Every structure is written in C-alpha cells, then in structure tokens.
Amino acid sequence: MELDAPVLGAGLLSADRLEQANINPSTGLATDYLNHFNEVVMLLEMLPAMPDCAADVLDWEPLDYEAHFEGSNFSDKKLAVLAYHAAPVKLRTHLEKHVSQINEAVHSAQELIRNTPDISIVAQQIADVATNEIKPLISSASGVIHGHVRPDAIQLEGEDAQAEIDALFA
C-alpha cells in the first residue's frame, strides 16, 4: 500500500497546525531558518567594535533547511521539515537560490578575514557587506517564506504552474 505524500493544508499540515508552529501555512516554510543567517550577520556587523568576533564568524558554517531544523531547538522541527518537503518545489528552489547567495557572501567575508593579517583593516568593509548585501538577501528569503514572490520570479512550468501560483498567493 502506497502512502500519499503530505499536502499543505491537510492532516498534519493543516493551516491551523502550521500557524501554531510558526510555519507559513501557504508556503510551508518557517522563518526560524533565517535565524542561522541573522546570527552570522550580527557577528559580521560587530567586527569593527569587537574584532574578537572574527573567530565566531570563521566557525560559522552553511546549513540547508533540513539540517538547520534537525540541529535546532525549534519545538516543531519535525513538522517544519515535513512542511518543507510539502512546499511547492519551485518555491523551495527560489528560497535555496537566495540561501546560496547568502552563503557565498558569508564565505567571501570569511576568506577576507582568513587572508588579512589584521582584522581591523577589513572589519568595516565586512560589516558594510553584511548590512548592504547580506541583510537584503535575508529579507528576500523572508519574502519567499512569507509568499511575497513575484510569480515571474519562480518561473513555473507545466500544467500545474497556475495551480501552484494560485496556492502560493491564496
């Protein structure tokens, strides 16, 4: 007997249940994932005043959505992962594109820290990148999580495309 894949809005993934868990019921995504990135941005922005934060920045590693929740204290982490897998593929792909850009920007900052003999030389530059480049990417990722995505940005294809767009903006 084959089990049906979980569907947003039904059963364990009912809108009420997702809302109670702080998971967007329309997208199946949770903003808690962004805490991982907000943490490193905070450290990057503190570098000019607290150069000792450089070690913590270098210790930061990218985590995908599922790995973040598996290692988090989020009370409904299993539900968050289940909802993520039920989220529209094109929406997840759009989120992952933003996450990849965030990870690349943080990696560049980490490389700059590793390759400078004195962190104070690059601390302000790195803090500016965090504020002016990484934070806007996190805001864009938040928009995806909340379903605030231009339909043309996710480039849906096939006969289910309109249904996915309609569900996203319902």
Describe each PLM feature range.
Residues 9-162:
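Signal-transmission coiled-coils
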Residues 3, 155-170:
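Short acidic DE-rich linear segments
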Residues 1-9:
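Short, low-complexity N-terminal regulatory "tails/caps" that precede and couple sensory modules
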